[in-house]
Amino acid sequence: MQNRNTFSWVKEPINRSISVLIIIYVITQTSISNAYPIFAQQGYENPREATGRIVCANCHLANKPVDIEVPQAVLPDTVFEAVVRIPYDSQLKQVLANGKKGGLNVGAVLILPEGFELAPPDRISPEMKEKIGNLSFQSYRPNKKNILVIGPVPGQKYREILFPILSPDPAAKKDAHFLKYPIYVGGNRGRGQIYPDGSKSNNTVYNATAAGTITKILRKEKGGYEISIADASDGRQVVDNIPPGPELLVSEGESIKLDQPLTSNPNVGGFGQGDAEIVLQDPLRVQGLLFFLASVTLAQIFLVLKKKQFEKVQLSEMNF
């Protein structure tokens, strides 16, 4: 009986420690996985500015291509594919937050017309689900279902992202109309150069904050550098901190100018945006067009038959 009580006394703190570790793991993993889309979602009510610029370009400074493919026209209440392509060289490696090199992630924002939204799972065909893979999409805001974000996801696997989209039905939604609509897309590969608070990441070039002579370069224990500069104007010491990742371009005793690059630019990624157009087609118009084409075809057939009949009559009269 005494042994059993002793075991219970030992078991209780072990279980408590395991629970704490699990909670810490869940919290850290959640914050890491949600960090990238939240940057834009928390800072901007709308990802597309009045100028047409998508706000992701504020953090991803390099300009890179992106492509979108959608059908020319869709019928109401129909699920269709919007394919976003984010090309880049798969051999490239980016600087990670710890200064080491790793693969590039990709992400995208898709700005659809009002009324268009992510297709519900029960409306997506098995073939489309297979193309989508394990991707998980989310709305930019709970009240903005027409704006979708995805990422970061591994670029090696998802350089082509398929969005399953449900078109609106004007018969059910009064604000939907049979018109031609624009679709906007933004896509990035790799990490950004600036954080939303304006601070630099380690995936960008670092410049001198003063002109003068480099008196000391201290290599930090956890990586990165501390560069001391004797200001040429007043002789005071200015210290520039370089995080791990960028490669140093200067040396001790070197004279430098204000804003001169102290490091290389390690960024190999970038952001791009594009647009496309889609027509929400009225089924009655399609039926009317088909009826018109059928009528024209039948009229041409009857005209040919009538002509042949007339030629036969003329031929018989000539023979008579």
UniProtKB/Swiss-Prot annotation:
Pfam family, one: Apocytochr_F_N
Required co-factors: heme
Transmembrane annotation, as ranges: 286-306
GO BP, sorted A to Z: photosynthesis
Gene3D superfamilies referenced in this protein's UniProt entry, alphabetically: 2.40.50.100, Cytochrome f large domain (2.60.40.830), Single helix bin (1.20.5.700)
Localisation per UniProt entry: Plastid, Chloroplast thylakoid membrane
Disulfide-bond pairs as recorded: none
Cellular component, GO annotation: chloroplast thylakoid membrane
Coiled-coil stretches: none
Residues that hold heme according to the record: 36, 56, 59-60
Gene Ontology molecular function: electron transfer activity; heme binding; iron ion binding
Keywords, in A-Z order: Chloroplast, Electron transport, Heme, Iron, Membrane, Metal-binding, Photosynthesis, Plastid, Signal, Thylakoid, Transmembrane, Transmembrane helix, Transport
UniProt KW Metal-binding keyword: yes
Bilayer topology annotation: Single-pass membrane protein
Residues of the signal peptide: 1-35
Comment on bound cofactor: Binds 1 heme group covalently.
Family: Belongs to the cytochrome f family.
Subunit structure: The 4 large subunits of the cytochrome b6-f complex are cytochrome b6, subunit IV (17 kDa polypeptide, petD), cytochrome f and the Rieske protein, while the 4 small subunits are PetG, PetL, PetM and PetN. The complex functions as a dimer.
General function of this protein: Component of the cytochrome b6-f complex, which mediates electron transfer between photosystem II (PSII) and photosystem I (PSI), cyclic electron flow around PSI, and state transitions.
Protein name: Cytochrome f
Gene field: petA
